[in-house]
Amino acid sequence: MSDVSADGGFLSAEQATTPVAIPTPYPSLTVSASYKEKSSGRRRPVRPSFDAAADNEFITLLHGSDPVKVELNRLENEVRDKDRELSEANAEIKALRLSERQREKACEELTDELAKLDGKLKLTESLLQSKNLEIKKINEEKKASMAAQFAAEATLRRVHAAQKDDDMPPIEAILAPLEAELKLARSEIGKLQEDNRALDRLTKSKEAALLDAERTVETALAKAALVDDLQNKNQELMKQIEICQEENKILDRMHRQKVAEVEKLTQTVRELEEAVLAGGAAANAVRDYQRKFQEMNEERKTLDRELARAKVTANRVATVVANEWKDGNDKVMPVKQWLEERRFLQGEMQQLRDKLAISDRAAKSEAQLKDKFQLRLRVLEETLRGTSSISIRNTPEGRSMSNGPSRRQSIGGSDNLQKFASNGFLSKKTPMRNSFTSNSTSVLKNAKGTSKSFDGGTRSLDRGKALLKGPGNYSFNKACDETKESESPNTWKEDSEEKPPSELPAPATEDNVPGVLYDLLQKEVVALRKSSHEKDQSLKDKDDAIEMLAKKVETLTKAMEVEAKKMRREVAAMEKEVAAMRVDKDQDNRAKRSSNTKPSSNTAQILAARAAGRSGLTRSTQ
């Protein structure tokens, strides 16, 4: 694996093997936050002195696949998914538009049928009006016949009063045929009234039948609308089933991809373990440079503070010398000096506050480190549960191995964790110069093998860099204090013997980079396993939902078939009823026509008889 620099970059082989005494500081090392506030206007960051082309070549060598390409591929896949969703939404919109058009057509058909029914109602109303007019005409004829009868009786009375001779025939002989005719006319009038009543009853029954037919038509239309709705729902359910099947296929594909990614990650973890063994020495050298730089910054801060104190004391001495020859009223401190002393005291107060904040952050970082190492222990217990235990030889008096750092030291495994649990801090073992050069040359050999398969590890590497920067918003340069003591084994031994564990530097960034990366990769593997299990469970749930939807569709189709059969039966019964009503109407019309012809013949006979009677009367009077 590649060596991490202070700004998140990588070191070449020549730069990693250079001795410690470098005239220029490490490239692009930024000043710490507390020092930057005071000396930002006085000092600028040092320009890099290493070759940028060599760094770029080394980066391209280590990275087999570009993370930008991976991200672009992921974005293209997301765009394709969004396009697919958009096409599905367009298809649903088209289906809804078609259903709306069908509903509009059904509404238009219903309006046409209602218009036809209105026309039929108007025809029946016109027939009723014509029947009422006929009844009025019959009543008027009846009144006219009664008036003619009364007039005939009056004429007969006058004739009877005018008769004086006894030779004329009796009045009873003349009145008898007239009374018979009157009885016949009255009986005919009664028959006509009965016919009129029967016609009224028939019209009312026909109106009731028409209303029933309208109701049945409305119910049939409502059932047809229900059938259309059921068909639309069936189509929607079929579409949902297709969508669920497509989602199931997509989830299967994603599951296969995740399984392949997990296999790739396991392979990259193995290769990273091999590369981590060679990258520890270069990382330790980088830590040494960073620690030296931070110590130089602290020395400069102390020198600045001493210079400020010297200025303040010099100003005070000057004021005392100047006030020796003055009176008591004139001995006043100058405003400029007072402002400078006030600024100096405020700076010291701010430094004390910064120290308090740093101590709080150190305490928080220690707590977070404890949590992190406990989590690492859990992860390692889960991963190494089935593996055989490996015995590790402990080197006395903190001496380093001659063949380079072991895997446990570079990864930050169980050995260092046991020492951390017992002492509260991690002991570091720095390699000798010869092992340092050999390990730095082995970085390139391992990097060539790992660059081809290192596809998905860039995100975890970025996370490792973020963790290395510290939980309390430390700058990366503050980590130089912890790595400064690994410059030589003698100084580390003396400091470890003289200082108690409480005075040693806080293990905010004591762990090497490879250990963090290994833990992150282990976490990602566990998370991927959990996500694959959850996806399997979600696939099972979706299969169950698809089965439920299929059952619902079957029940709906059966219900639709039953409703369609009922509708067909009802429509056939309605057609039969309409045919019977038409036959009844035809018979009624024929009966009406025959009844209309019969009274006309009877009235003709009555008029002929009346005319004959009148002619007989005139003859008798003559």
Swiss-Prot record:
Presence of the UniProt keyword rRNA-binding in the record: no
Annotated region (Required for targeting to microtubules), positions in chain: 250-483
Coiled coil: 66-365, 541-590
Induction note: Down-regulated during senescence.
Compositionally biased tracts (Polar residues): 400-425, 432-453, 594-605
Record's compositionally biased regions (Basic and acidic residues): 479-501, 579-591
Gene Ontology CC terms, in alphabetical order: cortical microtubule, transverse to long axis; phragmoplast; spindle
GO-annotated biological processes: cell wall organization; cytoskeleton organization; plant-type cell wall biogenesis; xylem and phloem pattern formation
Protein name: Microtubule-associated protein 70-1
Upper classification of the organism: Eukaryota, Viridiplantae, Streptophyta, Embryophyta, Tracheophyta
